[in-house]
C-alpha cells in the first residue's frame, strides 16, 4: 500500500510564494493573421490573392537587382516561393507593422532560437524548421492556444507522449530545451513515415492520422496537390506557406529590403541557454526550487527560468526529477540539497458532483483559502467533476 504524502501548507507557501507560471494565451495565430490581412487588403478568396499580386507586383525573385542575390531555401524550388499562398504571407510580413513584429519575435527569441538552430544542424534537419516556432507561438515559451496547445512548440496534452513528460507536477511543454528535442523527434518521426518534409511539417499541424486520410483521397503524395485540391484542413493549408514566407524573409532580409536579426555572430559563440549545455541535479523527492536557490545563494528567478517545467515550483515527490543548473554549479547544488528537507506533499482529492470548495474544506477541516493557495485557484472557482485538488495538512 502506497504511503500517503503530506504537506505543511504554511511552510510551503512561506518559502514558495510563486508556484505556477504565467501562461500567455494566444489565439490561432494563422487564423488571426489571415483575418487581419483580409481587413487590411480587402480580400477573402484565392482569386483575390492573385489580384493582389497583379495590382501591386511584389519585388519578385526575377525583378530584384542582381547585386543583392536571393538565397534559395534548401530543398524548396524557387517557383514554390512564388505561389500566391506563400506570397500572401510574405506581403503581410513585408508591411511595416508585421515586419516590426517579426523582427521583435526573432530578436526576443534569440536564446532559444539559436539552440533550435544548433539542434537542427546537429540532426541534419531542414533549416526552415528554425522558423516553425514563429508559426506555432511566435517563439513564446509559455504560449497557450484556445485549443489547449501549450509552449513554444504548441504540444497538445494528448500528443506529448512519448516525446515529453506531463503530469501534476511537471509539464515539459513549457521547457524550451526539452520541448525542442521533443518537437524535432516528432517531426523526424513524421518524415520517416511520409518520406517528405513538407508533408511531415504539415502533419505536425494536423496530425499523422489526419494527413494519412487526406493522402488516401489524393492522386499524388504531394503537399501542394493536397492544397490545390482542397484536401487539407484550412489551417494546415496555410501552415506551410506561412512557414516558407517567414523563412524566405529571414534568410533573404537584405534582398527584400527589411531588417531582421540573423544572430550569425552569436551563433559562432554559443553559451549558456543558446548552447543548451547545463549541469543537472537528480532528485526523487519534492524539493522547492526557491529553497534550493536560496541555499545555493543564487538568483531565484534565474533558477526558475532554467526549470520552467516544474509547474508547482518543486520537483516530483515520488519520481526522478532533474533540476537544470548553470554550468559548473552541480557541486554547490549537491551540498545545498543536503541541507533541505523534502516537502511532505498532501493527498489528492477528485471532485465529484455536488462538491464546492466550502464543502471540501469543511470535510477535511482546512480553510478554503488554504486549498486555493495550494492549487492556485480562486475562491469563487467553479469546480469541474473529475478535477484533482490537493488537500493541505491541517
Regions found by a protein language model. Give the residues of each.
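Extracytoplasmic/secreted proteins, especially bacterial periplasmic and envelope-associated proteins
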Residues: 88, 104, 108-111, 115, ...
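Sec/Tat signal peptide C-region and signal peptidase I cleavage site
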Residues: 16-20
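Extracellular LysM carbohydrate-binding repeats and other cell-envelope/extracellular binding modules
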Residues: 302-339, 367-394
Amino acid at each position: 500500500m502506497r504511503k500517503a504524502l503530506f504537506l505543511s501548507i504554511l511552510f510551503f507557501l512561506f518559502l514558495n510564494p510563486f508556484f505556477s507560471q504565467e501562461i500567455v494565451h494566444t489565439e490561432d495565430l494563422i487564423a488571426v493573421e489571415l483575418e487581419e490581412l483580409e481587413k487590411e487588403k480587402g480580400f477573402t478568396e484565392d482569386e483575390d490573392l492573385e489580384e493582389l499580386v497583379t495590382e501591386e507586383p511584389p519585388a519578385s525573385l526575377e525583378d530584384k537587382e542582381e547585386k543583392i542575390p536571393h538565397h534559395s531555401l534548401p530543398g524548396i524550388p524557387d517557383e514554390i516561393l512564388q505561389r500566391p499562398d506563400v506570397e500572401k504571407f510574405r506581403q503581410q510580413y513585408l508591411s511595416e507593422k508585421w515586419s516590426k513584429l517579426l523582427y521583435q519575435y526573432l530578436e526576443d527569441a534569440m536564446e532559444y532560437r539559436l539552440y533550435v538552430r544548433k539542434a537542427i544542424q546537429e540532426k541534419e534537419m531542414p533549416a526552415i524548421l528554425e522558423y516553425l516556432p514563429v508559426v506555432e507561438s511566435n517563439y513564446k515559451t509559455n504560449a497557450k492556444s484556445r485549443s489547449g496547445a501549450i509552449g513554444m512548440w504548441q504540444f497538445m496534452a494528448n500528443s506529448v507522449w512519448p516525446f515529453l513528460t506531463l503530469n501534476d507536477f511537471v509539464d515539459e511543454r513549457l521547457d524550451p530545451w526539452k520541448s525542442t528535442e521533443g518537437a524535432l523527434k516528432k517531426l523526424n518521426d513524421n518524415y520517416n513515415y511520409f518520406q517528405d518534409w513538407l508533408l511531415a511539417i504539415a502533419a505536425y499541424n494536423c496530425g499523422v492520422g489526419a494527413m494519412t486520410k487526406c493522402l488516401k483521397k489524393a492522386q499524388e503524395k504531394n503537399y501542394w496537390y493536397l492544397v490545390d485540391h482542397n484536401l487539407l484542413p484550412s489551417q494546415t493549408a496555410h501552415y506551410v506557406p506561412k512557414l516558407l514566407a517567414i523563412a524566405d524573409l529571414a534568410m533573404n532580409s537584405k534582398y527584400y529590403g527589411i531588417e531582421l536579426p540573423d544572430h550569425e555572430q552569436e551563433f559562432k559563440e554559443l553559451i549558456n541557454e543558446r548552447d543548451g549545455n547545463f549541469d543537472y541535479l537528480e532528485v526523487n523527492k519534492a524539493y522547492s526550487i526557491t529553497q534550493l536557490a536560496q541555499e545555493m545563494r543564487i538568483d531565484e528567478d534565474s533558477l526558475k527560468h532554467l526549470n520552467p517545467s516544474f509547474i508547482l515550483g518543486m520537483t516530483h515527490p515520488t519520481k526522478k526529477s532533474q533540476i537544470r543548473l548553470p554550468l559548473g554549479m552541480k557541486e554547490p547544488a549537491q551540498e545545498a540539497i543536503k541541507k533541505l528537507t523534502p516537502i511532505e506533499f498532501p493527498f489528492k482529492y477528485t471532485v465529484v458532483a455536488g462538491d464546492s470548495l466550502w464543502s471540501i474544506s469543511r470535510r477535511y477541516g482546512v480553510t478554503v483559502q488554504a486549498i486555493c493557495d495550494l492549487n492556485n485557484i480562486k475562491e469563487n472557482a467553479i469546480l469541474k467533476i473529475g478535477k484533482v485538488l490537493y488537500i493541505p495538512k491541517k
